[in-house]
Amino acid sequence: MVVTRSARAKASIQAASAESSGQKSFAANGIQAHPESSTGSDARTTAESQTTGKQSLIPRTPKARKRKSRTTGSLPKGTEPSTDGETSEAESNYSVSEHHDTILRVTRRRQILIACSPVSSVRKKPKVTPTKESYTEEIVSEAESHVSGISRIVLPTEKTTGARRSKAKSLTDPSQESHTEAISDAETSSSDISFSGIATRRTRSMQRKLKAQTEKKDSKIVPGNEKQIVGTPVNSEDSDTRQTSHLQARSLSEINKPNFYNNDFDDDFSHRSSENILTVHEQANVESLKETKQNCKDLDEDANGITDEGKEINEKSSQLKNLSELQDTSLQQLVSQRHSTPQNKNAVSVHSNLNSEAVMKSLTQTFATVEVGRWNNNKKSPIKASDLTKFGDCGGSDDEEESTVISVSEDMNSEGNVDFECDTKLYTSAPNTSQGKDNSVLLVLSSDESQQSENSENEEDTLCFVENSGQRESLSGDTGSLSCDNALFVIDTTPGMSADKNFYLEEEDKASEVAIEEEKEEEEDEKSEEDSSDHDENEDEFSDEEDFLNSTKAKLLKLTSSSIDPGLSIKQLGGLYINFNADKLQSNKRTLTQIKEKKKNELLQKAVITPDFEKNHCVPPYSESKYQLQKKRRKERQKTAGDGWFGMKAPEMTNELKNDLKALKMRASMDPKRFYKKNDRDGFPKYFQIGTIVDNPADFYHSRIPKKQRKRTIVEELLADSEFRRYNRRKYSEIMAEKAANAAGKKFRKKKKFRN
């Protein structure tokens, strides 16, 4: 394991600066994770002496202090005993000015390897060791010293809060994962300068770097040698920018957690702005050098667009129009610049003011310097894309997301002078190397933070995720289902006749059609982007169906007046709802014809000539005599008991009926409760009916005969009646006593007669 002094110096810089300034902070997670994971170095004193000048320039929030106390623990200075004493002084100077050294950033949920040196994590995440440790740091030191000037100018400028990041996690398009391997090399090459072309917002770290650059007028980078002469304010600001880039790299990596490096240059590595250059260049595996060469070739075409894009950053009117242009140019330029900086020995001295114009001028100078050695550096710079996936392996908690990346354009001394005018700059996360294969665009609408940068930590920007993929397919599928659902079930109103006259919809079919139409209308309202041609066809179909339903409803209302509408023409069916004898059906009869037929039947009944006319002995008279009419009326009258008895008919006499009538007569003579007229006792009645007595509900409790006591016949009822039996016994004893008295009197008379 190679532990460099540069990493050690960087850790001391960040720890000291984080400890000294505990008043204001942004993106606290990366700030505390960085000093903990950095390795030791013998050049600690040099780095600390260089950082003391600008420690107070770094604002931090209480969240940063809390996070720091959690992760770093007892590492206020972040120094450890040096393990590599042979590293040159140039490396230590380089580590001070460059914030791309080996860094392991540890969050709550994941650990991100920024550098190739093995480091320890707080959460005991698996350590990732570098695959190539023998890569010469002398070459990297001066190359990254050039990049340090670039990274200080170009920082990630997007303000992302926890709410937006939580939305972006669920809204990133998974279709971008297919392009990750093709873009991995380009991603690594453009990680530190990702926002050079599309810097939509200036952060606090950007303003601090602008300060550092104004103070860095004495610092010079020697192109031939590996040593750098860098002022102390530059070192402190480099450490600050290192920490800031850590925070922003982690935030966008958390946003793109499902697809590790799909949103390459704009999401994941634009926020790592300038700290990852050593991470990429010290890796051993070169996965896709051809695409990096192609991206370097595209730099010549888009080199002229850098200055235009820098001007567009300061203009609010041209922000939305140049969105795709900014994406293309920034991607290609960053790729070429990434590969050219490790071998570029030319000095890059950037002098910037607090205003954005000086920043863009310095960017153009940097790009001009970088373009010199892009072809010589394509094959020499080893790139490993596994570092890209490491950002997606680690996760951050919700508390960390709230305090992580709050990119605020804040300047401690001059807030009003720096105004980058980035109100509603749309930030596209789709990589351009895929060239039109991305189906989704991540639109981050960020608010204006010109002078109120301190309060912008509490702001929550909205994240708009527009899905363009699969809408036509879903629309076509909906139309297909409509065509299947629109099949109508019809009923033949004239069975057996012509089956193509009238067709009616059932009530269920009508309800289902109306429900389908309502659902489809709601779906059409919800869909924001649909093809106009398909939509017009659907509307035509709906209009035709509505016309058909309206016509059928009008017919159905005219059929019947009953509450239950069967949906059939009852009159056409001859007054029958269901007729199984379709052959004998007499349909469409008019009332006039029916009246005429009735009259014919009546006349035929009175006719003398009948089918059996030949069998008669004489010709029957046409009109009957009065006597005959009286006989007929009498016969008809005798059939019923008359209107007084409601037309009660005489039943057919049977033996059972005769026995019942006899019992009734006997009871009449023996039961004092019954009284019958004398006329009713003679013979049997002619008109009578035998029925069952239905109990009144009120008689259920007081005058009801239980089921067990009910008898089958009248005789059994009489025998079961206790009162009737008592009465019968008494009468029987009286009769018997009378007979005995009569018999005794007769005997007495006879004896007396003999005596005489």
Swiss-Prot record:
Molecular functions per Gene Ontology: RNA binding
Gene Ontology, cellular component aspect: chromosome; nucleolus; nucleoplasm; small-subunit processome
Chain intervals with Low complexity compositional bias: 9-21
Keyword Ligase applies: no
Modified residues (Phosphothreonine): 129, 232, 610
Recorded superkingdom: Eukaryota
Basic residues: bias regions: 201-211
Organs and tissues of expression: Widely expressed with higher levels in testis.
Region annotation TdBR region: where it falls in the sequence: 548-605
Coiled-coil ranges from the UniProt annotation: 505-542
Function, in words: Regulates the transcriptional activity of DNTT and ESR1. May function as a chromatin remodeling protein. Part of the small subunit (SSU) processome, first precursor of the small eukaryotic ribosomal subunit. During the assembly of the SSU processome in the nucleolus, many ribosome biogenesis factors, an RNA chaperone and ribosomal proteins associate with the nascent pre-rRNA and work in concert to generate RNA folding, modifications, rearrangements and cleavage as well as targeted degradation of pre-ribosomal RNA by the RNA exosome.
Protein name: Deoxynucleotidyltransferase terminal-interacting protein 2
Organism: Homo sapiens (Human)
Taxonomic path: Eukaryota, Metazoa, Chordata, Craniata, Vertebrata
